[in-house]
Every structure is written in C-alpha cells, then in structure tokens.
C-alpha cells in the first residue's frame, strides 16, 4: 500500500473517462500520486467511477465495488469512494447496501471528494486533465445530458437536461491540449448535434468544428455521434 497514492478506476464510456482525467489532475495538483485502472489496489485510497446505463454495466460496476470492498476488509486499502452514473442514479440504495464504501458521490459533485480529503478544488486547473489516452489524441466533451425522451434510454434520468459548454472554454481546452502534444480530437457528448441550442439558441456544432479545425496543431477531428439531427 503506497502512501499518498490514489487509484482511479474508470468504467463505462469516454465521457466518464474525461471526468476521471479531470479528477486526476485535481488530485495531482493537491499533491497526490495517481494511478489509473490498476488491476489491484496500489494506494491507500481508491475511487471507482461507475457506469449505470445498462444491466451489464451496472453489474460490472457492482462487481468492481465489491472487489475493492474485499481489498479494504483485507487491509489492502484504507478508503474507498464511488462516483459516476451508477451512484448518481442509485446513491441511497448503494449507501444502504454497501456500507463498506466510505462515501458515494454522483456524476457531477465529485469535487466534494477533494473537500472530504481535506483538499481544495483548484479552479485554475478547471480545464486541465491528466490524459490516460495515447499522447497523440484526447476526448473532448462539449456538453452534458440529453433533452430526448427515448423510452429505452436512462441517460436523461441520470445526467439531466442538455447543457452545452461555452465555446470559448472548449477552444481554450483544445489549445492547451495541443500544447501538450495532442493532434487528434475525438468530440463526445450524449447528443453532439444539440450543441449550442441552450447557450446560443441554435445548433452550433458546425461552427465549433470549424473553430477547432482552425486551431494550429489540430490535425484530425472525429465526431462520436449518437444521433444525426442537423
């Protein structure tokens, strides 16, 4: 068990991965050494970022939580925290059924983990991430949530209404990532084509793509679309 080390385990989609990368940067800025997706606990603390979208994903998340609970009971881990979509949707039930977990967080309040560790969220690193992808590419999350009401999909229940990120903030992040060697951007959201409708009252994905493409150093852009709606 390594002191001052935190293990981050990410389950689910690339949007979850971006959240983990942001948390990792905040933890590192507060002096922690962070490992990602380790098979076994290495540090004193573990944070599991869960998925709660479909049955298989829920099962995988529960099994991972129980595996780390066992490690905690065996003295291989001091603290265990859980965040992400599963705990956003079932926080009360999980806290009741798995009391070995020190605290459950939702998908959007993971910054409270820093306070519970006696640390502070550093706003100057708000758009910074510790990349876990190969150095030449990164995921770029441009919005959260979804306004569609598809009967088969739980995403709106978990993540809420569609919320676009400000375009200037996204471009600043692209420039920062390019300065770190990123050449390819994989643009992600639950519904890419809704980008801008809430902030700018019209669909702004084409304009956003053009602005990203015009940033010096950007060589490739990929769109991860859930639905075509332009």
Q: What residue ranges belong to the model's regions?
A:
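Proteins enriched for Cys/Gly/acidic motifs involved in redox and nucleic-acid/cofactor modification
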Residues: 1-195
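S-adenosylmethionine
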Residues: 199
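Alpha-helix-loop-beta-strand connector modules within alpha/beta enzyme cores
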Residues: 202-220
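Conserved small/polar residues in nucleotide/adenosyl-binding loops
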Residues: 228-230
């Amino acid at each position: 068990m390594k002191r001052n080390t935190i293990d981050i385990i990410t389950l689910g989609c690339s949007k979850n991965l971006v959240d983990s990368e942001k948390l990792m940067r905040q933890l590192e800025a507060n002096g922690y050494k962070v490992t990602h997706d380790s098979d076994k606990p290495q540090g004193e603390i573990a944070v599991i970022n869960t998925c709660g979208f479909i049955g298989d994903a829920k099962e995988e998340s529960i099994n991972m939580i129980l595996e780390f609970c066992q490690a905690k009971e065996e003295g291989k881990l001091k603290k265990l925290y859980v965040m992400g979509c599963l705990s956003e949707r079932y926080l009360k039930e999980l806290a009741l059924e798995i009391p070995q977990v020190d605290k459950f967080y939702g998908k959007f309040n993971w910054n409270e983990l820093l306070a519970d560790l006696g640390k502070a969220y550093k706003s100057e690193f708000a758009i910074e991430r510790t990349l876990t992808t190969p150095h030449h590419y990164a995921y770029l999350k441009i919005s959260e949530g979804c306004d569609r009401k598809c009967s088969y999909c739980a995403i709106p229940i978990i993540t809420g209404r569609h919320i676009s990120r400000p375009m200037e903030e996204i471009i600043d992040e692209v420039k920062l990532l390019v300065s770190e060697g990123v050449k390819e951007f994989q643009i992600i959201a639950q519904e890419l084509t809704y980008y801008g409708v809430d902030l700018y009252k019209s669909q702004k994905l084409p304009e956003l793509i053009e602005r990203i493409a015009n940033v010096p150093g950007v060589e490739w852009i990929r769109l991860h679309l859930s639905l075509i709606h332009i």
